Regions:
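Short, charged, low-complexity amphipathic alpha-helix
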Residues: 200-253
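Extended, charge-rich alpha-helical segments
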Residues: 84-91, 242-277
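A short, compositionally biased
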Residues: 14-18, 168-171, 259-264
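Mg2+/Mn2+-dependent nuclease catalytic core
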Residues: 97-208
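Short, charged/polar micro-motifs that form catalytic or ligand-binding hotspots
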Residues: 48-56, 141-149, 234, 238-241, ...
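Metal-dependent nuclease catalytic cores that hydrolyze phosphodiester bonds in DNA/RNA
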Residues: 1-112
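Hydrophobic/aromatic-lined pockets within catalytic cores
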Residues: 70, 157-164, 242, 256
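A residue-level signal for conserved active-site and pocket-lining positions in enzyme catalytic cores
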Residues: 62-63, 155, 237
């Protein structure tokens, strides 16, 4: 198969300083605000503004360091975050294809995918860089990871609209952080965390609800089927199988011995079973 290149939408612009998206002059909404409004309206409650600002500033700094490495091979030797990012890329075989790749639904929404990694001629994976406090794999941070899942799912949905001939293999969070805590210890995290994509229908419904000014309700996930195994029955059948095979082996050995003594090469039982020596 011939390699399929990424499509870049003519007229789609991202003004990074103001974090605004435009398509041929029409302003589009980013998905981050939609996710907050529709699904996690209280996620920032009680967090002082100066902490939010400091977190955003740190995140922007790390994003830029990683982007400069991926796009320009500019290496910041003092950045532990870059060292950890490069280690993750080596461990998981990530092949950088694009950073801050713009996607859109061509009507109301747009976003910039942090990372797009090439998997094959027609397949990519999409990664999102997170520098937030707290291990995202821990139960206490389940909501943070679910927010990432929704964000990546919307990226995937719009990526496929922009690139209808391509496929998306995996969605994952690259959680990279190295900050000094108040007690002087180092809060260092370097993890790749896979997330399961939401169905395309759910992504469309979420964005449609936002356009209509309606409140979106996330469909309940189907309960996971539990695997049940009757271990005692399996053990009994395996034991029976072993005993039967042992008896058959003894019968076969005796028959072959008797046939050899009688000079017979073929024997057919009264019920039609044919035995050949």
């Amino acid at each position: 198969m011939a390699r399929i290149e990424l499509n870049y939408v003519d007229g789609l612009v991202f003004q990074e300083d103001e974090h605004r998206y435009f398509l041929n002059g029409k302003e589009l909404s980013g998905v981050t605000s939609v996710i907050t409004k529709q699904l996690f309206p209280h996620s920032m409650d009680g967090i002082p503004k100066h902490i939010l600002n400091a977190s955003a500033e740190y995140g922007s700094k790390v994003h830029k360091i990683l982007e400069n490495w991926d796009k320009l091979w500019q290496k910041d030797d003092e950045s532990v975050e870059l060292q950890d990012y490069r280690s993750i890329c080596r461990e998981y075989g990530l092949v950088h294809e694009a950073s801050e790749y713009l996607v859109t639904d061509f009507q109301n929404f747009a976003s910039a995918c942090d990372k797009v990694y090439r998997v094959s001629d027609d397949t990519v994976s999409i990664g999102d860089i997170k520098t937030v406090y707290g291990d995202l794999t821990k139960k206490a941070n389940k909501e943070k990871l679910e927010r990432c899942r929704v964000q990546l799912s919307l990226y995937r949905y719009m990526f496929l609209l922009v690139n209808p001939k391509m496929k998306v293999k995996d969605l994952f969070v690259l959680h990279i952080r190295c900050k000094e805590r108040k007690n002087g210890t180092i809060d260092r995290i370097a993890k790749l965390i896979y997330v399961e994509p939401l169905p395309i229908s759910t992504c469309k419904a979420l964005l449609e609800a936002e356009v209509k000014g309606e409140q979106f309700v996330m469909p309940e996930a189907e309960p996971q089927k539990e695997l049940t195994v009757d271990e005692s029955l399996i053990r009994h059948l395996l034991q029976t199988k072993a005993e039967v095979e042992e008896q058959l082996s003894k019968i076969k050995a005796r028959l072959l011995s008797d046939m050899e003594a009688l000079g017979e090469t073929t024997y057919i039982t009264p019920t039609g079973i044919k035995i050949v020596r």
